[in-house]
């Protein structure tokens, strides 16, 4: 009997290893290089300093007017598998530098978008949406660091937020900013933690999001940013590092383990 349980346990571990390799995705960019697995769109580029520059910078090192840039991990990420939904965790560090910190626009977003989707409208739409009205076909969820309105927004399929929290980006202009975003599919909980590393000020916001209803089975994950329409409202958007991991709840493994024990 004992040997049978040991054999079953060994089989379980083999199956678990295979299942995890099939349902987990992870990557880490401590800095960025031109040969990284990234899709760059618009004005996005990798700087000589190893930073991901989303919006354009002129020869005078000042931000370009009405610039748009997007960068997504090149491999699609599976979010849904039948009735199973992945949880994910992402950490990144960015710096937004405004020419005039009191009136800059528009901000930076972390987004889950349809695979192979092109850039959308500029300005307040941040390159990820096209309208102020609901777009069911947009199939996009975004966490927006909205410098125009000094807040963190959660957007689903159009630019108007369904949840937001004040966060004074203008006041902490140019600071290195650490962000963690987590999604727990077991309770549909999306959370954002933001930390301005110099001033030690923190912002956080959370909401219930049924991700399986809002995005496609496979998505692209990454960033999009836009800069203001006039020189006084321009800003740069640089991502310094980025890591991401996602994992499905392994229902089959739980069933097998309960039967063994």
From Swiss-Prot:
Monomer. It comes from Phaseolus vulgaris. InterPro entries: ConA-like_dom_sf (IPR013320), L-lectin (IPR016363), Lectin_LegA_CS (IPR000985), Legume_lectin_dom (IPR001220), Leguminous_Lectin (IPR050258). The lineage of its organism: Eukaryota, Viridiplantae, Streptophyta, Embryophyta, Tracheophyta. Glycans are attached at residues 43, 91, 100. Keywords: Disulfide bond, Glycoprotein, Lectin, Plant defense, Seed storage protein, Signal, Storage protein, Toxin. It holds the Pfam family Lectin_legB. The keyword Glycoprotein applies. Gene3D superfamilies: 2.60.120.200. Residues 255-261 form a propeptide. Disulfide bonds join 167-203. Seed storage. This carbohydrate-binding lectin has toxic effects on bean bruchid pests. Residues 1-21 form the signal peptide. It comes from the Eukaryota. The C-terminal segment appears to be highly susceptible to proteolysis. The gene is ARC5A. GO terms for biological process: defense response. This is Arcelin-5A. Belongs to the leguminous lectin family. One of its GO terms (molecular function) is toxin activity.
